[in-house]
Amino acid sequence: MARFLNSNIRKFLTTQIRMSSDQLGELGKGAGKGGGGGGAVRQAGGAFGKKQAAEEEMYFKRKEQEQLSALRRHHQEEIDHHKKEIERLQHEITRHESKIKKLKHDD
């Protein structure tokens, strides 16, 4: 039941966000059209408003790229760690197998 509720809430919120973003208009075109009141320059609109909106978009895009890069690095480190762990366990398996062979030969 909780899964059903969560997916419905998620769909509702996604729909609401999508609908409200369609009503925003073009970024940097003045108050109420480009993401709300983003300061005096954004509210005034015009070339400076568009420039500020573009700079903000670039800032967030850059931040997103940095986060993705950090996430990729983290996952690669995890993969390397697990590969080393597999190698260590393979050596342990080989060691134990050799002990078993030695015990069989001693019989």
From Swiss-Prot:
Gene3D superfamilies membership: Single helix bin
Q: Which GO terms describe its cellular component?
A: cytoplasm; mitochondrion
Q: Name one Pfam family in it.
A: IATP
- Key word Transit peptide present in the record? yes
> According to the UniProt record, where is the region N-terminal inhibitory region?
24-53
Q: Give compartment(s).
A: Mitochondrion
Query: InterPro entries of this UniProt entry?
Result: ATPase_inhibitor_mt
In the record, biological process GO terms are:
chordate embryonic development; erythrocyte differentiation; heme biosynthetic process; negative regulation of mitochondrial ATP synthesis coupled proton transport; protein homotetramerization
UniProt feature coiled coil, ranges: 62-107
For this chain, the family text in UniProt reads: Belongs to the ATPase inhibitor family.
Q: How does it assemble?
A: Homodimer; represents the active form and is present at a pH value below 6.5. Homotetramer; represents the inactive form and is present at a pH value above 7.0.
Q: What is this protein called?
A: ATPase inhibitor B, mitochondrial
The scientific name of the source species is Danio rerio (Zebrafish)
Q: Recite the lineage of the species.
A: Eukaryota, Metazoa, Chordata, Craniata, Vertebrata
Chain's gene name: atp5if1b
